[in-house]
Amino acid sequence: MDFNAVNAAAEGYREDMVKFLRDLVKIPGESAEEGNKIARAKAEMEKLGFDKIDIDPQGNLLGYMGSGEKLIAFDGHMDTVGIGEMSNWKFDPYDGYETETEIGGRGTSDQEGGIVSA
């Protein structure tokens, strides 16, 4: 597989991925209260043309694309821990920040950035 071709194709999604991640950061979602994050992710899956999207009784978002003998699965979580004392933050954790090389905010490294990348 040509890494440069894959990387070039991925670059075409950068703007949409950044917007999706920034949207997720802005939505509070502590454990068992991440329903609004799930709704935003579901909307993104619909936009991307997933064949089937379900939310199970536990609130897990399940998306399906394609068919075949082999299955590729991705498992992640969107809940976050509380922000604690706002005065301890150098930036608003629910607004986050963006530079040329990074996006910061509540949940970006655990695990919303990975979910957006998948």
Annotate each PLM feature.
Residues 107-118:
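Active-site alpha-helical elements of protease catalytic centers
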